[in-house]
């Protein structure tokens, strides 16, 4: 299982421009998927429908060479990171163009039920979704360049506690806040320190550990 990154993307600007983004991201599409069949010892191909994807990296940028995209990734153990994702297989292409391993679009079988959109009181919208291992920085950068009149803010936090807030305007990202850890109790950033007595990380401010129990040694 991957480490998950929890993302919140706000989009603000003129309501007509926001409506264009909403329509783009929620545009219906279909994709072919391959999976290994242990009974037949072959790869099975199936088509997945996305009638109401809500938010889809596929609707921001998609590969031109679908034949190459659907090939099985060929990565070698110990291969340098800068050489791992040069191919056009789905894994390499996704990492290069989206910044993360998988899309977050909601399929008709509700595979990604954690993806949602909220209307904000100021007229903007917020998308909420989870990505594997890393935030979708490349995808949001491309989306921002496609809509230069809108302001995109990506808030993300990995399940171990590191995260950031990045603002995108006209394809340019600016880091507003970046941290290595955050206390889930008091929200203090970069405040976690290892306690030998507790055997876990404890917030230096509120003395709570990751399990949200008070550290008696603080």
What residue ranges belong to the model's regions?
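Short glycine/proline-enriched coil/turn segments at helix->beta-strand junctions
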Residues: 148, 191-192
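Short, intrinsically disordered terminal segments enriched in charged and Pro/Gly residues
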Residues: 210-218
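Intrinsic disorder/low-complexity signal
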Residues: 16, 184, 192-196, 210-211
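Long, contiguous binding/interaction regions
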Residues: 1-182
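Short cysteine-rich clusters marking metal-coordination/redox-active sites
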Residues: 183-186, 195, 203, 215
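Zinc-coordinating Cys/His ligand positions in small cysteine/histidine-rich zinc-finger domains
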Residues: 189-191, 200-206, 212
């Amino acid at each position: 299982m991957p480490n998950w990154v929890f993302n919140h993307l706000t989009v603000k600007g003129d309501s007509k421009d926001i409506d264009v983004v909403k329509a783009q991201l929620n545009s219906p599409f279909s994709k072919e998927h391959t999976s290994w069949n242990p009974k037949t010892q072959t790869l099975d191909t199936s088509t997945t429908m996305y009638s109401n994807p809500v938010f889809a990296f596929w609707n921001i940028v998609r590969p031109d060479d679908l034949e190459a995209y659907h090939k099985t990734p060929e990565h070698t153990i110990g291969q340098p990171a800068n050489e791992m994702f040069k191919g056009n297989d789905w894994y390499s292409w996704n990492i290069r163009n989206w910044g993360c391993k998988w899309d977050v679009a909601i399929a008709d079988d509700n595979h990604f039920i954690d993806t949602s959109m909220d209307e904000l009181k100021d007229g903007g919208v917020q998308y909420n979704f989870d990505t594997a291992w890393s935030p979708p920085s490349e995808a949001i950068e491309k989306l921002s360049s496609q809509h230069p009149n809108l302001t995109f803010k990506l808030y993300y936090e990995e399940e171990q506690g590191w995260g950031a807030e990045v603002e995108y305007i006209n394809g340019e990202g600016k880091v507003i806040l970046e941290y290595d850890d955050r206390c889930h109790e008091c929200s203090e950033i970069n405040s976690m320190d290892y306690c030998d007595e507790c055997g876990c990380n404890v917030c230096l401010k509120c003395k709570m550990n990751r399990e949200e129990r008070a550290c008696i040694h603080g």
